[in-house]
Amino acid sequence: MTSFPYEIIEDPRPRLGLIALQVDETIEEDFRQMFPQPAARLHISRVPSGAELTPDTIAAMEEDLPQAARLLPPAARFEVIAYGCTSGTSLIGAGRVRELIHANATTHAVSDPLSAAIAALRALKVTHVGIVSPYIASVAAPIRAGFEAADLVVPDMLGFGEEIEARVARIAPASICAAAHAVAARAELDAIFLSCTNLRTLEVIPTLEEELDLPVLSSNQVLGWHMASLAGLALRDLAVPGQLGKKAAQL
């Protein structure tokens, strides 16, 4: 075989890395919707996760997170890598997530849905937040605690009481909307947060904001927004829904 010369070039687009749960059927599609291909390069790894999301399966994810980070392309230099689990971050700890990812992949910044949600709420200058979660109380409650530790007030929280991730991915958008209306009716709120990256939320955000006259945030929406902000991407080039999509982060 004759050797032929070639040239090497680097793609100038920002690289984003996403570590999704093995059972998550929603986040990857949502991210490809929010980040059109010309805007950034998106690389996705998966972390093993049980069919049920419980404190025990989340603890196991902490052990598997380093290997999931190492499965991202090792030659790539990422602007941001995110761990895509809201409840996982609340139980493992955002600081620990950052530590594990930085130790196992090359990236300027690390994000997660809990940190992203707090940054988004601060950017929107809201303090009283209602939460809708698909999970049982032992998985959902630490998210509330994470918000409260960031000096946010959570007047009310609703959950679907679900443990099986395959069912979470199939919760009807109409049910999500009904829960958002219910939590808004039960307390004075500045915003609503729809928790869980496996919940199908992007499509309902514009309608809910119009009906409730409140900012409506969700795990995938805030994570995409936060990653874009950390990577220096212009929000006008993305498709982040709702009021948040027009708001720059205060980093």
Predicted regions and their residues:
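Glycine/small-residue-rich loop that forms an oxyanion/phosphate-binding "nest" at active or ligand-binding sites
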Residues: 68-115
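Periplasmic-binding protein-like
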Residues: 78-84, 130-131, 189-196
